[in-house]
Amino acid sequence: MARGERRRRAVPAEGVRTAERAARGGPGRRDGRGGGPRSTAGGVALAVVVLSLALGMSGRWVLAWYRARRAVTLHSAPPVLPADSSSPAVAPDLFWGTYRPHVYFGMKTRSPKPLLTGLMWAQQGTTPGTPKLRHTCEQGDGVGPYGWEFHDGLSFGRQHIQDGALRLTTEFVKRPGGQHGGDWSWRVTVEPQDSGTSALPLVSLFFYVVTDGKEVLLPEVGAKGQLKFISGHTSELGDFRFTLLPPTSPGDTAPKYGSYNVFWTSNPGLPLLTEMVKSRLNSWFQHRPPGAPPERYLGLPGSLKWEDRGPSGQGQGQFLIQQVTLKIPISIEFVFESGSAQAGGNQALPRLAGSLLTQALESHAEGFRERFEKTFQLKEKGLSSGEQVLGQAALSGLLGGIGYFYGQGLVLPDIGVEGSEQKVDPALFPPVPLFTAVPSRSFFPRGFLWDEGFHQLVVQRWDPSLTREALGHWLGLLNADGWIGREQILGDEARARVPPEFLVQRAVHANPPTLLLPVAHMLEVGDPDDLAFLRKALPRLHAWFSWLHQSQAGPLPLSYRWRGRDPALPTLLNPKTLPSGLDDYPRASHPSVTERHLDLRCWVALGARVLTRLAEHLGEAEVAAELGPLAASLEAAESLDELHWAPELGVFADFGNHTKAVQLKPRPPQGLVRVVGRPQPQLQYVDALGYVSLFPLLLRLLDPTSSRLGPLLDILADSRHLWSPFGLRSLAASSSFYGQRNSEHDPPYWRGAVWLNVNYLALGALHHYGHLEGPHQARAAKLHGELRANVVGNVWRQYQATGFLWEQYSDRDGRGMGCRPFHGWTSLVLLAMAEDY
């Protein structure tokens, strides 16, 4: 036992004693899940428990069954959003959108059974056999850079994609009208990357429409396979028509010669669309433009029948795709017209195409630029035109990465006995929708709980209504206990991109409650629409916080421990803490129930503070009275010092069963395995100086006069520890874990690299303390300016060099690392440029 730990256990601080009653009888004690009414399912299950015990059945088995049932039961609190909130009747402006972030370009409706559209392309004749077909964003497909130049999150976007010798520009604009979400139009332009090239390639563009149910598509095909239009009808869209207009040269109106192939079949399943098209590109055709030599190309067979129609194809949906093959440069427009929009006026609306489409696109682009400057004021703050372009791309990439998902996740229930969860079979969560931004279109095209709070800090500055929509959907995922899964893998398309072993979410695992960061901003701004939303959201926010506070409780009052560290993996240098979001950040070398995690305690303190202030503002006296004492106890300096200040290290730290004497050594045939030397592990503070050490500062939990603030600023500003020319590194360069692999196949992740989300928190904290009177005010302000220059400057240089925002950045040379594009929390660079914290 570490020096001083015996004293702490025997004589807890008065603040800890005072808080124990609130902490252990605190939020949600009345019904175990945040004060909300019990669900009907919960009541029935409880009755079964009582009856089973009366009949002599095993109480432990029944309790496990009861907990398993609650894990996949939706919470009973009133929903924040109505059930039809995504319908065209309630939100027509959001019904259609680029809600398929994993494809290079596509749109769909916000519906459990959506109508989907998309684009594929291939350059003919560059490689033997089937040409490289581009459709879904992939990390290693060689495409790039790519990303949205403009995207307003609602009705307009312009994206540029570089693919070898090709440069594609995809644009869309929506036009409101009618009762079904209005009209929209695309323009896809393909030009040579090198304007001076003489050998212009032959390119095939594939425009497709997919239905996901019994909806009907009726194509009208003209001579030589040219699709004139597609008419259709669905219950949500009414009557509609798609039209693929004849191709032209960019900026011209004269039609350009193209070769056409059309294919119509049953929907094979959304994850299989790419492979189906690849497999059908097996017939040779001749492209014969007038006055030019013919060229061969691989095309789709001209099937116009609905294949597999019958018992096996009923209700499967349809897949209709038009291939257009021609020489670049080209521009093609694809138009969707809603029947109700056309019928809504006294005269038919002109088609949103040609010069009318050009005018609409330019008008929206100019409106975006003006709104962007008015919102973020980068030009006024003196940032260069290039940095302003970076800011626009950061915002647009985040908004263009918003997706709509629907499906059932797999949940492994918490049966209440730690370590036994693997003995329980996973169960399906109820079908739920999710409207969310994603971290990365190529690598993480789905919802992540702790990422989303950072995403919405950016989104809400631009469009608060989008943030309300996203938060409402996330809170709709709450189960009966108040748990939200940290990774949402909903629907076939999302599931197809995740290895099977990672599909299951464990109901005992938490995640940092970052959704409270945009909630705190809403409360600070005080917009009436936000406050009305928060009034509806409070019961679910309360339930979610109560679950976190209770389920992750640590060994001592006011201490907390991330569940989910696996001690039984001999190949890991340090067992991961995935629920914390910091994955391989070094914790106690030997996981145990004695651990106390500093970052988690700080997150709980932030949650208690935000929800107390929210309850007070809304006049919810009962919630405020319940959470207020807990918030005060968690923010008390004595309590934080008692549990997490490590005098021998001079910083705040985790506590647990730990030794530094661990290393990976080769042990054939196992490969690298962990070897523990001397000294043997003992209960002590964990000497891993890094992001975790800063959390009391990052979340602004310290008083500006605190004696602990100075030492934290010291390590933050020390280049031997966390300071680098490119931002704060995640783990001190002086740490024995710095830059170390966690296993043979697991390179360092949170062990030195610079991450934008934590650097943004650090900038906000330094800005905060730099504006509060205290002994460290001037130093905090100076460090803020220097850190901001380092972070913004490096992201800008890497964007110039690569065209991408990256997941993380090297603390050694600043280069982008990890996956790209990463317009998730790296988009926080925009708020750093705007000095908006």
Swiss-Prot record:
Cellular localisation: Endoplasmic reticulum membrane
Top-level taxon of the source organism: Eukaryota
Gene Ontology cellular component list: endoplasmic reticulum; endoplasmic reticulum membrane; extracellular exosome; membrane
Effect of F652L: In CDGIIb; loss of activity
Region (Disordered): 1-39
Pathway: Glycan metabolism; N-glycan degradation
Motif Endoplasmic reticulum targeting per UniProt: ranges: 3-9
Glycosylation sites: N657
Name of this chain's protein: Mannosyl-oligosaccharide glucosidase
Lineage, broadest ranks: Eukaryota, Metazoa, Chordata, Craniata, Vertebrata
